[in-house]
UniProtKB/Swiss-Prot annotation:
Transmembrane segments: none annotated. Catalyzes the interconversion of methylthioribose-1-phosphate (MTR-1-P) into methylthioribulose-1-phosphate (MTRu-1-P). The record marks C174 as: Transition state stabilizer. Signal peptide: none annotated. GO terms for biological process: L-methionine salvage from methylthioadenosine. This is Methylthioribose-1-phosphate isomerase 2. Its main location: cytoplasm. It comes from the Eukaryota. It is found in: Cytoplasm; Nucleus. It is an enzyme of class 5 (isomerase). The lineage of its organism: Eukaryota, Discoba, Euglenozoa, Kinetoplastea, Metakinetoplastina. It comes from Trypanosoma cruzi (strain CL Brener). Pathway: Amino-acid biosynthesis; L-methionine biosynthesis via salvage pathway; L-methionine from S-methyl-5-thio-alpha-D-ribose 1-phosphate: step 1/6. It catalyses: 5-(methylsulfanyl)-alpha-D-ribose 1-phosphate = 5-(methylsulfanyl)-D-ribulose 1-phosphate.
Length: 372
């Protein structure tokens, strides 16, 4: 029997004029919400990965800019003391926040569109323009929730039909659930839907070093809803696929290029290579805002690299646990590129499942985007 949707987990707490974001670095040991008051607050929250997950970053950014403008409006000599000053503040805020993290396309696409919409708003007062921005941001929020629901529904239905088993076992990486989006999730949203319908045997979650989003966040979400979950270390994926019945690999995405090449959490390509070897269908689940027809392929994607201490220091104690020496170099890319040829199952969006062609180009992202 299908279960009702459960939306008890949330990383974004918003009401007009106020925004609080869950500091996901502290989960699962602490549940701490940070109040976001300024543009600097949201830039730092994104940069420091207090908020993470491409959809959640984009939604939080839009809401935060509206909240920051409202707070600026309250200042006697603030930047929002005129219509022109407010518009300038909003546009410059979008530009600033876009620089926080470069790889996820949702952030830049969302804020570029928000800038266009703000430029088109006709307002007689600064307060009217701030209110219009809040309405635009709230629309972005609501649309992401609707995207989550569409991805869940289409993905679960497609997998059920493909696998033709009463229950499905799925492997995933990172965290792509309610904590990474506005409500239910993308790849983990599909897992949720399978669970709600009584069709999930097991979800296997990679720990996802170095931030352990799988161990800390995905497992946390599964435990909260009693979703059957098995945690594995990242290096166990090939052994898992070779020894246990894995019906599909489902991952999220931070950017899907015009040819279908996909930027996602580091380690995703490892899963795709292993899945191809063992004949396991590999799916990418993401909202259509993650589709990027302007970027030709994975070679054109800027891959974010983070601080070396994420690899050399214990996250719990902040003490160095790796030897130091002049011959040592540290490489810490946050994302990798999965070639479109390895996305063998298809791309799941809120519009349906885009299945690959038999030969290159395997996906026509431009056609999908232009059809919207």
């Amino acid at each position: 029997m299908a279960r009702a949707h459960n939306a008890t987990l949330e990383s974004i707490q918003y009401a007009r004029g106020t925004l609080r974001l869950l500091d996901q670095r502290k989960l699962p040991l602490e549940t701490v919400f940070d109040e976001i008051l300024t543009v600097d607050d949201i830039w730092t929250a994104i940069k420091e990965m207090r908020v993470r997950g491409a959809p959640a970053i984009a939604v939080s950014a839009a809401l935060a800019i509206a909240v920051a403008a409202g707070n600026e409006l309250k200042k006697k000599d603030g930047a929002c003391n005129s219509v022109d000053g407010t518009r300038r503040f909003l546009l410059e805020s979008c530009d600033t926040v876009m620089t926080a993290r470069p790889t996820a396309v949702n952030l830049s696409k969302t804020l570029i569109q928000l800038k266009r919409d703000i430029a088109d708003v006709t307002a007689n007062t600064a307060g009217g323009l701030v209110e219009a921005c809040a309405v635009l941001a709230e629309k972005i929020y609501a649309e992401d929730v609707a995207c989550n629901e569409g991805i869940m529904r289409h993905g679960a239905a497609h997998l059920t039909q493909l696998v033709k088993k009463s229950k499905v076992s799925v492997l995933t990486i990172c965290n792509t659930g309610a904590l990474a989006t506005s409500r239910y999730g993308t790849a983990l949203g599909v897992v949720r839907q399978l669970f709600y319908e009584g069709k999930l045997e097991q979800v296997y979650a990679c720990e996802t070093r170095p931030w352990n989003q799988g161990a800390r966040l995905t497992v946390y979400e599964c435990v909260q809803e009693n979703i059957p979950c098995t945690l594995i270390c990242d290096s166990a994926v090939s052994a898992l696929m070779g020894s246990r019945p894995i019906d599909a690999v489902i991952v999220g995405a931070d950017r899907i290029c015009r040819n279908g090449d996909t930027a996602n959490k580091i380690g995703t390509c490892n899963l795709a290579v292993a899945a191809a070897h063992y004949g396991v269908p590999f799916f990418v689940a993401a909202p259509s805002t993650t589709l990027d027809p302007m970027t030709a392929d994975g070679e054109s994607v800027v891959i974010e690299e983070r601080e070396t201490m994420e690899l050399t220091h214990s996250m719990a104690t902040q003490q160095r646990v790796v030897a130091e020496g002049p011959s040592l170099r540290i490489w810490n890319p946050v994302f990798d590129i999965t070639p479109a040829a390895l996305v063998t199952g298809g791309i799941i969006t809120e519009r349906g499942v885009l299945q690959p062609s038999a030969t290159a180009p395997f996906f026509d992202i431009t056609r999908i985007v232009s059809a919207s």
